[in-house]
């Protein structure tokens, strides 16, 4: 005996006129005399199942009446095309097998507060919009990895437990590590993926990263996922060109394959359709001038002194001036990570860039050319107040066959928020971890 279905809702069009068995959960139910209308979801889609009392046994009709929201069941019936039905097909039911009758479902078709929904996140992800968001997230991840694989990149997995910081020491999660001292949850896989790059040439890592930032903004999570490519012999300009192609390919893939989910979210796709290379580029200095001239256009946006980093309002302002993602490049070295290559024409700035998404979504990618001179790297590590002994293996990469190289990291959740058009990053990951949120 098997409980597996003989068809899925997403492929129901291939079974028109056939009798199939679906397995899933009840989304909605309406009773009208001798008719019971059941909307069933199976994870791949939703279909309306029609139970007509005259065509089924009393036991089957009673089972239909007994079903509640989120009850699990197997429903057998004939597939019938109907232009009026959701998805264009209905199921004329002839048998129902109840697996479980669910008690009253906590999430009702009414307005619920954010805290309530987050407390019930394990159930909220079943709703149509959350389902669509997470489908888009999954498509972005698949598109990113498949595109990189097609370009000759090798996936290179990096450790989550690390002995030292990669992005600064102020936002580390620390944990005792047996007799070896303290371990830290990885802020990025980049340092380790550089080792892989020296072996394979073109690599990427994909996994969770952790930042102990006490921030409550709509753009921040303490645990998020990053995909981080690294390329040997790539200079700064090569890195920007790679990012353009990468982001554009992902967006086009989502537009092609997840149109229904974008429609569920009522996402205006016109801004996404404009996401084709080349992306505009401005320098940090040019960004400061724009902010000085236009800061009144965005609430909370104030002029910056040279050497100050861009905040969310500044990113929103700059991105609003362009119709597609925009690079802000050549930031002051002092406000960026220690491993970034200085501009040979102007050493006080780094060969780096942030890619800002339009419509107020802010930075989705950060990248740079990396320092490849071991003496310069060691000097920068000391300047940042870090323990050189912790980074000897990283400096070693430059001692044995060092080459110029570049890479970047794209945050999956920020990219999902932008592409899906959702306001808050907490809805772009199944179970968000934030300053005041660690349940469920």
Swiss-Prot record:
Its EC number is 6.1.1.22. GO terms for biological process: asparaginyl-tRNA aminoacylation. Homodimer. It is found in: Cytoplasm. SUPFAM superfamilies: Class II aaRS and biotin synthetases, Nucleic acid-binding proteins. The keyword Protein biosynthesis applies. GO terms for molecular function: asparagine-tRNA ligase activity; ATP binding; nucleic acid binding. Belongs to the class-II aminoacyl-tRNA synthetase family. One of its GO terms (cellular component) is cytoplasm. InterPro entries: Aa-tRNA-synt_II, aa-tRNA-synth_II, aa-tRNA-synth_II/BPL/LPL, Asn-tRNA-ligase, Asp/Asn-tRNA-synth_IIb, NA-bd_OB-fold, NA-bd_OB_tRNA. Pfam families: tRNA-synt_2, tRNA_anti-codon. Keywords: Aminoacyl-tRNA synthetase, ATP-binding, Cytoplasm, Ligase, Nucleotide-binding, Protein biosynthesis. This is Asparagine--tRNA ligase. The keyword Aminoacyl-tRNA synthetase applies. It catalyses: tRNA(Asn) + L-asparagine + ATP = L-asparaginyl-tRNA(Asn) + AMP + diphosphate + H(+).
